[in-house]
Amino acid sequence: MAQYQRIFAALDGASTQKAVAKRAAALAADNGARLLFGHVVDSVPNEANGADYEALCAEGVVRIEDELADELRAVRENPAIPSVDVQVRAGRVAETLAEQLIEPFAPDLVVCGERGLSNIKYVFVGSVSTYLIRNLRCDVLVVKQQA
């Protein structure tokens, strides 16, 4: 198995978000890897109303810190994980995630969740996990939804 040094966890607010955070944290601890949690606020629904993206990103960090408080506390207290950070950006989700969060961090591994889109929606918008698998040069681990 590869020795991962930098792990990126893509958070989307879906039901798999905690599972993604826990899996990424476990892998980071096992490998002594730096860990970055990232989230993208979808700008498409907000483009027409002139949203304040800086405020949306700040709110996103607060929301993630709140929703994953227990997981983040455990990760930050784990001496096997050298660094932990949470970053939020606004934009088109898949592209912004890849270009503004993942590529600058240069991870060895990206951990993301399965969104569970309907067949119709998948045809029209695709999925973020599929985009990441096809476009990133590093390993991508997709955490499946539990039935």
Residue ranges: model-predicted function:
Residues 2, 76-110, 147:
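Structural beta-alpha unit
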Residues 2-54:
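Small/aliphatic-rich secondary-structure junction motif
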Residues 20, 47-50, 96-99, 122-123:
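Short, well-ordered secondary-structure micro-motifs
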Residues 24, 72, 97:
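Aromatic/hydrophobic pocket-lining residues that form π-stacking "cages" and hydrophobic walls in ligand
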Residues 26, 102-147:
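Gly/Ser-rich helix-loop-strand patches that form or flank binding pockets
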Residues 36-38, 85-89, 141:
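General small-molecule cofactor/ligand-binding pocket signal
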Residues 54-67:
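A short acidic, glycine-rich active-site loop
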